[in-house]
Amino acid sequence: MTKTYYFIGIKGTGMGPLAQILHDQGNTVLGSDIDSYTYTQAPLEAAGIKILPFSADNVDRYADAIFVRGNAFNDDHVEVQRALTLGVKMISYPDAVQEQIAQTTSIAVAGAHGKTSTTGLLAHVVKNIAPTSYLIGDGTGRGVPNSQFFVVEADEYRRHFKDYAPDYAILTNIDFDHPDYYEDINDVTRAFSDFANHVKKDIFAWGDDPYLRLLQPKADVYYYGTNSEQDDFVATNIRKSTQGSHFDVVFRGQSLGEFSVPLFGQHSILNALSVIAVAYMEKMDLSLIKSFLMTYQGVKRRFSEKQIADITVIDDYAHHPTEIDATLDAARQKYPNKQIIAIFQPHTYSRVIAYKDEFAKSLEAADKVYLANIFGSAREKQGAVTSAEIGAEISKFGGIIEEDNMSLLMPYENAVMVFMGAGDIEKYEFAYEKLLGQLRTDLQ
């Protein structure tokens, strides 16, 4: 029996994919959000899903629908307030996700870093082997009626994942990435412990993470990594090239064969290893796993590349020092003979205050560094720190860029420009690309 769902905040990076899933499953889906364009709305529009501006009248008009409430919306939001007044059926985003988890063999991917890339890779492999629905944090969702598997990105922010009860879970790492919510790393670890205790079958955790080693869930834990003395699934004989990464996999002394991924950086090998581990334990054909790993093309805003004349532009969501390390490492592997120029927009004042020194250290891996001003959030409009303070600690700092003045970036030729950030770094990237395209055309 099909239903009608109304999403309050339908353009959210989780809400959009969930809306797509429910639509694909034959339900009537619509929702509301802000007017300004976001990259998550394109697939919604392509599916014919109606997007309305926020209005209390929407609730009156669709009062018979099931309302899905986005995590960002409090009781005083105009539509939430009206829904509460009318007493319509309203469920939270996590509750709606859990409904999908409960219907299939479910695999959740959680971690401070790497969860979107890992979820995307896992979904790609599994969907090509068996009927699979998936929800990825880059705004991508797909619903398949009578799915055998459901692959989902599980977000730890504000403990959104705490009530998920998947069959399997991949835990990529634990880190203090949300200082605006969590008290400290111990608080984050407690949240992951709560989540892990809901996993029904097996957990696959990165073996080098000391906080993941502290977890004592009811489910069996298989550690993956590069240490044959402590890990269950081990990547050995690692070879990195400008075409990708290659490695052998051993499970508790048993060789599973050689694998390759068209991805770059040590983190990509670990992500792929976790996917191999889950698929192997679900008794999927190893030859199929190998084949589909090689055809993966990535997810949005994770090392996304484009070429403009002699310049390679990379767009990445990296907004934490660990993620910057991984992105610049990947750029070095793929482009070992080119200048790597980092353009970074810090995200939230609380994160910059917590990691100012670490940001500077991570960015030193680039040949030159440029910063945009800090992107705040709905909860943090301003703070007692600036991007210039990060720049002052970077020996290769080139200056602060402005959207209407890209002159600092224009002298580079045959270089790799790496734009990183979780705010609106894309507007700087687009401004640079537009000017670069004009200048290169004029020179021809």
Curated annotation (Swiss-Prot):
UniProt-annotated binding residues for ATP: G111, A112, H113, G114, K115, T116, S117
GO terms under cellular component: cytoplasm
Pathway involvement of the protein, from the record: Cell wall biogenesis; peptidoglycan biosynthesis
Taxonomy, superkingdom: Bacteria
UniProt keyword annotations, A-Z: ATP-binding, Cell cycle, Cell division, Cell shape, Cell wall biogenesis/degradation, Cytoplasm, Ligase, Nucleotide-binding, Peptidoglycan synthesis
Localisation: Cytoplasm
Catalytic class of the enzyme: ligase
A biological process term (GO) from this entry: peptidoglycan biosynthetic process
Any one Gene Ontology molecular-function term assigned to this protein's record: ATP binding
Major location (coarse): cytoplasm
Described function: Cell wall formation.
PANTHER family, per the entry: UDP-N-ACETYLMURAMATE--L-ALANINE LIGASE, UDP-N-ACETYLMURAMATE--L-ALANINE LIGASE-RELATED
Similarity-based family: Belongs to the MurCDEF family.
Name of this chain's protein: UDP-N-acetylmuramate--L-alanine ligase
Organism: Leuconostoc citreum (strain KM20)
Gene giving rise to this polypeptide: murC
